[in-house]
Curated annotation (Swiss-Prot):
Cofactor: Fe(2+)
One cellular-component annotation, GO: cytoplasm
Similarity comment text for this entry: Belongs to the KAE1 / TsaD family.
Species name: Cupriavidus pinatubonensis (strain JMP 134 / LMG 1197)
Protein name, as recorded: tRNA N6-adenosine threonylcarbamoyltransferase
Protein's job: Required for the formation of a threonylcarbamoyl group on adenosine at position 37 (t(6)A37) in tRNAs that read codons beginning with adenine. Is involved in the transfer of the threonylcarbamoyl moiety of threonylcarbamoyl-AMP (TC-AMP) to the N6 group of A37, together with TsaE and TsaB. TsaD likely plays a direct catalytic role in this reaction.
Keyword Iron: yes
GO MF terms held by the record: iron ion binding; N(6)-L-threonylcarbamoyladenine synthase activity
Gene3D superfamilies the UniProt entry points to: 3.30.420.40
Amino-acid positions noted as binding substrate in the UniProt annotation, renumbered to this chain: 134-138, 167, 180, 273
Cellular localization per UniProt: Cytoplasm
Free-text comment on the cofactor: Binds 1 Fe(2+) ion per subunit.
EC number, as in UniProt: 2.3.1.234
Gene: tsaD
Domain of life: Bacteria
Length: 344
């Protein structure tokens, strides 16, 4: 089965072709970072208009790279939510038009389910069950994953997500957009321990997160350093990243201990952070836990993860198109709420 995946939830237009026997055949991505940089963040109307311009040329690109035609497509998966409503509607509209024209099934995919399953695109994919640390944009969650569509929420952020804290800290430090990678790069030059920042909810006794207080602590430090030199900024960035990593690592391994699972999957944009990967790998080696990550190319939003998630859903429930969530979009959508028809 050849599945076309379409991702358009925010500021990346991603398309991919995934074959259930041969694996990922091709993928293409256009990022809008340069367009939004002058505004310091994503402008929804501009994002939607750019998706419209990019989606069909990218479709032709993935078909050409895979040596396939539109007639070869057996099913279409698109990001149904969560995300920006206008941006989501672009992908959903293209999926609908192609689906009806080709008379093939369509399936709406949860954006975070795509991230959660993205490590399965690697050469050594993790088997079920596992614990997933999802750190993507406005989401920071710990999920117990027993199989496709079988997800239990163990913990989540009570205020700012880790990605949001990165972006806000970048602004406080006078860094560019997007903030996360800029903070991580600056932190590489920082001295560990130069600043003492809090580890919110580190000893809360549950698996929830909170990063608003950490952001406030960074704000307090920047105000104390009115004439901040470059090394001070690097040291503060390092202290911030270390605090985030400490909390994410501690909560992840607490979830593993609580459930008894021996596999940890890390997905989403922050999952590309080098310091986080090093800490989790170190703890995994010490505690005999296997840690899995997506390829760096698939940490950001992409069509490959949507094609894979759609293919896995259609394989698990062949009549899914008849039991679909509908062909609209769901800008607000909890991952723990989705189920396969047989599990509903």
């Amino acid at each position: 089965m050849l599945v076309l995946g379409i991702e358009s939830s925010c500021d990346e237009t991603g398309l991919a072709l995934y074959d259930t026997e041969a694996g990922l055949l091709s993928h293409a991505l256009h990022s809008q970072i340069a367009m939004h940089r002058d505004y310091g963040g994503v402008v929804p109307e501009l994002a939607s208009r750019d998706h419209i311009r990019r989606v069909l040329p990218l479709l032709q690109q993935v078909l050409d790279e895979a040596g396939r035609s539109r007639a070869d497509i057996d099913a279409i998966a698109f990001t149904q939510g969560p995300g920006l409503a206008g941006a989501l509607l672009v992908g959903a509209s293209v999926a609908n038009a192609l689906g009806f024209a080709l008379n093939v099934p369509m399936v709406g995919v949860h954006h975070l389910e795509g991230h959660l399953l993205s490590p399965l695109l690697t050469r050594e994919p993790p088997p079920f069950p596992f614990i997933a640390l999802l750190v993507s944009g406005g989401h920071t969650q710990l999920m117990e994953v027993k199989g496709i569509g079988d997800y239990t929420l163990l913990g989540e952020t009570l205020d700012d997500a880790a990605g949001e804290a990165f972006d806000k800290t970048a602004k406080l430090l006078g860094l560019g957009y997007p903030g996360g990678p800029e903070v991580s790069r600056l932190a590489e030059f920082g001295t560990p321990g130069a600043f003492d920042l809090p580890r919110p909810m580190l000893h809360s006794g549950n698996l929830d997160f909170s990063f608003a207080g950490l952001k406030t602590a960074v704000l307090t430090q920047t105000r104390k350093l009115a004439n901040t030199c470059e090394q001070d900024r690097a040291n503060l960035a390092r202290a911030f990243v270390d605090a985030i990593v400490d909390v994410l690592a501690a909560k992840s391994f607490a979830a593993l201990k609580q459930t008894g699972h021996k596999r940890l999957v890390v997905a989403g944009g922050v999952g590309a952070n080098r310091q986080l990967r090093e800490r989790l790998n170190q703890l995994g080696k010490q505690r005999k836990i296997d840690v899995y990550y997506p390829d760096l190319a698939f940490c950001t939003d992409n069509g490959a993860m949507i094609a894979l998630a759609g293919a896995m859903r259609l394989q698990a429930a062949p009549d899914l198109a008849q039991h679909s969530y509908g062909y609209g979009v769901t800008p607000r959508w909890d991952l723990a709420d989705i189920r396969l028809p047989s599990a509903a």
